[in-house]
């Protein structure tokens, strides 16, 4: 009997490890929330908030998982496409940028929505609309910034730690066996070779050219190619500086942007709406819908990258990111 009990104890542990109970609610579909106003037409406000990536956030105890910004925009734009009352779209941006591809995909989705839906799209930069955030803003017909907003930071960045010296100090040595000379390209365990640095710079230059092309194509009336090149050294601009340099179309408050969009539509009344997950969310035009993908602490670029939220897998992360 004693032997049987000893046998059952590890068996129970094995069976327990096979049982998984989810105590976080499932992600619910987006629901429309009226922020303000009245009337038949709707002006939809969508938030691009925090670092732009393909990574969402798993739910904790009693909280829903949160899709990535890319997934959120796709879901929201599909929902808006089928609503015949949507008369205009405002992308409210508060982002330092993020992944190159994630930024480009959101830009593409908004551009495709605008062409198919045939409604005006405004980008409103609330606090920060830098690098990838500014890239996404190029999908809009008009870019407006809050008087105290920061924008710009046109460029590409890629970073790594070189920990070879640290490993040597603690007596740890890494060995790599590879099929080709560049298989461990950009490894943190050794300094990069001149050839590798040149290869990486070539990739960055190509992605930078893409950024320049997108801005050039969408800011034809405000910027010449030579003017844009002079501004595209990675620096940020205040709203006033951005307006003077042709990077934005207007410096105004959000209420003014909404009024301006109504005027362009030839209407005086409209419901301003957003899409959010069901919650105790109390809506105003300044409320961020409760589906943030990054916490306040994670909004600074380096923390997000090295905490794994932007680049969860090994490799080089190419970023359209303002990273002070």
Model-derived features: positions:
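N-terminal organellar transit peptides
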Residues: 2-9, 13-129, 140-146, 158-324
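Short gly/pro/ser/thr-enriched loop/turn and capping motifs at secondary-structure boundaries
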Residues: 130-131, 150-154
């Amino acid at each position: 009997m004693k032997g049987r009990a000893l046998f059952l104890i590890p068996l129970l542990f094995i069976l327990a490890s096979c049982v998984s109970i989810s105590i976080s609610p499932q992600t619910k579909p987006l629901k429309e929330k009226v922020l303000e106003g009245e009337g038949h037409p709707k002006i939809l406000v969508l938030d691009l908030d925090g670092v732009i990536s393909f990574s969402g956030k798993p739910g904790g105890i009693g909280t829903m998982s949160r899709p990535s910004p890319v997934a959120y925009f796709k879901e929201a734009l599909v929902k808006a496409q089928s609503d015949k009352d949507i008369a205009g779209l405002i992308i409210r941006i508060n982002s330092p940028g993020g992944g190159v591809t994630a930024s480009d995909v959101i830009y593409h989705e908004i551009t495709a929505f605008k062409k198919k839906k045939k409604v005006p799209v405004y980008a409103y930069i609330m606090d920060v609309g830098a690098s990838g955030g500014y890239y996404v803003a190029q999908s809009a017909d008009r870019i407006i910034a809050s008087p105290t907003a920061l924008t710009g930071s046109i460029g590409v960045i890629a970073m790594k730690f070189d920990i070879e010296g640290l490993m040597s100090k603690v007596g740890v040595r890494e060995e790599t066996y590879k099929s080709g000379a560049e298989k461990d390209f950009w490894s943190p365990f050794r300094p990069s070779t001149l050839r590798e640095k040149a290869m990486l710079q070539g990739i960055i230059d190509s992605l930078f050219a893409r950024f320049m092309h997108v801005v050039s194509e969408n800011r034809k009336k405000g910027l010449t190619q030579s003017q844009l090149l002079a501004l595209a050294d990675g620096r940020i601009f205040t709203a006033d500086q951005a307006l003077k340099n042709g990077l934005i179309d207007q410096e105004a408050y959000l209420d003014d942007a909404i009024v301006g969009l109504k005027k362009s539509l030839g209407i005086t009344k409209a419901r301003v709406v957003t899409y959010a997950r069901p919650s105790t969310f109390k809506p105003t035009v300044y409320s961020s819908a409760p589906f943030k993908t990054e916490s306040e602490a994670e909004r600074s670029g380096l923390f997000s990258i090295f905490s794994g939220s932007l680049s969860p897998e090994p490799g080089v992360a190419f970023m359209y990111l303002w990273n002070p």
